[in-house]
């Protein structure tokens, strides 16, 4: 991953909500494994983690804010859409559409028709000048349709090769619009 020009950032040591969170331990383990300084953090399920805690652990940025509303999860409608700073930490939120802050997170690509998803990405690019999207490797697995995994149909119907194709078409469209792909570390100016 590192030799391919990709950034390794932390998703914590544990994937619980906040109980057992260990951003410092995760950072140390990843740095030992990769030989690279880990500057970024994104909490599991985009849970709230104190900026002071992350800064004290040595992180430079947090990308755990989804500036939208998700019932029973969080209401971040008043959170900034673009980079802000708190406790010596850059806060780089996940992208949402403009003006209505429709979520552009991983589930959206599964369930939305690609033309609609692209239109929402276009609105975010126009408003914010960047896209900060995230996906999980397991989403691209063809095994999600296996009932043993218990993945809901609304996610598994567009997974594996179907999601790979949709994602490839999204990337090609973004490239055709002149979008530049980079690491978050580079975008925020923390490149080593």
Please annotate each region the language model reported.
Residues 101-111:
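Surface-exposed cleft-lining segments at the edges of enzyme active sites
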Residues 1-99, 115-192:
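Catalytic alpha-helical scaffold of carbohydrate-active enzymes acting on polysaccharides/glycoconjugates
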């Amino acid at each position: 991953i590192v030799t391919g020009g990709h950034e390794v950032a932390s998703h914590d040591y544990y994937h619980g909500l906040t109980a057992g969170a260990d951003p410092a331990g995760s950072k140390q383990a990843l740095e030992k494994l990769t030989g690279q300084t880990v500057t970024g953090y994104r909490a599991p399920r985009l849970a709230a983690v104190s900026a002071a805690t992350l800064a004290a652990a040595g992180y430079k940025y947090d990308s755990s804010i989804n500036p939208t509303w998700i019932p029973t999860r969080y209401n971040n409608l008043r959170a900034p859409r673009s980079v802000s700073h708190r406790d010596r930490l850059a806060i780089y939120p996940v992208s949402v559409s403009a003006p209505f802050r429709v979520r552009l997170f991983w589930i959206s690509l599964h369930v939305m028709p690609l033309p609609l998803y692209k239109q929402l990405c276009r609105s975010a690019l126009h408003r914010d000048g960047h896209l900060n999207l995230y996906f999980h490797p397991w989403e691209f697995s063809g095994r999600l349709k296996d009932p043993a995994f218990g993945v809901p149909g609304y996610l598994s119907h567009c997974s594996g090769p179907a999601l790979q194709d949709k994602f490839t078409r999204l990337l090609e469209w973004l490239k055709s619009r002149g979008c530049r792909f980079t690491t978050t570390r580079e975008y925020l100016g923390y490149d080593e």
